[in-house]
Amino acid sequence: MPPNGAITTTPRSRMPPTTPSSGKSRPKKETLHYLAASSSTTSVDAARTLLERGANVNAIDRDGATPLHYACTHDNVAMAQLLLTFGADPMSADKLGRTAYSIAKGNTLRFLRRYKKSSNRQRLGFFRRFFACHSRNETFFIVRNNQEVAPLRPTALAEAASISFNRGNVLTNSYRCAKKKIRATFHAIRRSRSNSTATLQDVVLTSEGIRTVTTPSRRAPKATVYAKRSMSVSDLLLIPDRRDIKNEDVKTRGSPVKKTRGTGRSRTPEAILNPRKQRTPVNHHKRSKSQETKLVAMPSPNSMAYYNTSRARNAGLRPAPSAPPLSPEPAIAAVKTPKTPTTPKTSKGRSKSPANTTAYFTADESLELLGNNMEKLNIESKSAKSSKLKTPSKPTTSSSTSFSSAEDDKEAEVSTPTTVDDGEIRKIRRLREGELKSELKKFGISPAGPLDARTRRLYEKKLLIERRKITNRGYSPDADVVSCRNSPQLELVLRNGFLPADFASRARKCDENVRSEFSGNGFGYNAFCYLIMDPRILGSNVENLTLETFVRSIFYVGKGSKNRPLAHFIDARNERRDKLDKLKTCEKLKTIDELWTLGFGIPRHEISHGVSDEEAFVREASIIEAVKLKNLRNKKAGEFHGTTKSWDNITKSEYGTFLLDRALSTLKLEGIRLITEDNLPDSLYPYVNNRRGAGGGRTPKTPK
């Protein structure tokens, strides 16, 4: 819409009120005046809706001010642009003679200055005619000759102006994109000149109505150019099919083809893509036959050029020996110096590809390359790691320091810069959502909520770290953990028959950390752990007892003090006497009752005497983690305290396996001691006549 054009549509708002005495119209502030003072997006949308419905953009209040006056006073640029688009007059004065231009300030004043620079003739004529060829605004149309134009609705002008304001024409954008549009217009004018010979009519919507501007006919172009009125489907080039390409190959089969390095694009014949373009003859008499039939060899890049730069020399980098070239005689190829690549001779058969001479590093060579800079990169070599695992470290005084160092060793073990791609990340990324969740649950990780593109990458990284921890400790991450009777760590020891050196070293380090953390002031020394075993599996020959038989015979692991282990047997005896239903519901009491019924004595073995309650809880939980809760009669798993809560399942199982191996050693030294129903005391405190609270009274005196 021209900025100074007036809206001629009839407003739908009600007529201004009149005074009963004089009958003269008494203008008052309309809704547009209130909206013009606000710069919010809601106000701009509401004002645009009112203007589209036919509100008067130049309505005045009692002081003669228009909505544009309010927009300029409050420095509301967006509202001023909207009002100018719908035909507001910036030079209309109020009762005091002030115009919107005179009271404007800030960004609104700058906009009005730029707006006032160009004359009305330029704004109405030049820019509309200039950008009509490629503008997307609905205020410009190009029609054919002798074609009727549909009549417009009364509010069509306001709707067209609103659409123009929404999409952003030149005036509303303050002529900021004028240069870009001018450059793009040159191509549009060039296309219109070559594709049009008829007369064009531009229908321009103005405040006076529809104005038709006729463009004079241009001269007809040359005969070689196929002139058309506009772009159509027939102008598009035909896409060649297989038959066309095959026919073109048959025609050009006799001409020699130059075998050069291609760009990777499809070799579609030029004659099919551009049928109207004349093919220029190529001068072949200067080109020899040998040049046309030989392959053009490209110089191989020098992969060692980086090590000759000053930056690499200052960093202490040096080229490491690469893998031997792909040659049948590696010894001779290593002695010979590399020659300049020559042009190979052509042969009728299939040409052999040259050997790959690109230098690369293997995993061992990478470690040798970084051997001198281990301290800079804070990486330990492979031999240092193995020696560190075999030799147990000294016990530290601070538990937090020891555990932090252990975690640092794990992280350095998992994510080092020299980690070779073992295919784990590709395996993980191929997992589906359900498979990924099940793999995470094996390591005690439960995803919260659904997996999207952002959270899946995080859980993939966690799973990769856990799998590499297992791989670095000698286990297979793809092993079926569910099918194993015990934990994979205990199964490994049972299969080998002994504790590996690195396995025992890590377990000793965990034992030292537990001792240092849960001993000292504030901790007691009266707790221990105990094991209750099945005599049918354990047998009576302690000397020939194996670790596998010992582990399979354990059906209960507990922690207690004083006579706590006897409490299970006393409860079972009382239930047997009273014949209660607890023998059927409690698996532990049911097993004890079954063994006593068969006439067996039940062996009990106590370990880790004189420790605190927290340390005994950790040891009990580690043994349960190694044996697995499903193989025991315990109702729940153990409890971890302190820094042991952050242990992973591998560390817990390794420590529990270590404790079981020690328990077997002490059992062989002390022997098997059986508990029967007959040799049990009546209570846990047989030498106390009446415990405090039992019986509800004082202890009776002994008669004289």
UniProtKB/Swiss-Prot annotation:
ANK repeat ranges, renumbered to this chain: 28-59, 63-93
Location of the GIY-YIG domain: 525-635
Gene designation: lem-3
Chief localization: cytoplasm
Organism: Caenorhabditis elegans
Name under which the protein is recorded: Ankyrin repeat and LEM domain-containing protein 1 homolog
Keyword annotations from UniProtKB, A to Z: ANK repeat, Cell cycle, Cell division, Chromosome, Cytoplasm, Cytoskeleton, DNA damage, DNA repair, Endonuclease, Hydrolase, Meiosis, Mitosis, Nuclease, Nucleus, Phosphoprotein, Repeat
Gene3D superfamilies xref list: 1.10.720.40, Ankyrin repeat-containing domain (1.25.40.20)
Gene Ontology cellular-component terms listed: condensed chromosome; cytoplasm; midbody; mitotic spindle midzone; nucleoplasm; spindle midzone
Region span, Disordered: 1-29, 247-293, 314-358, 381-421
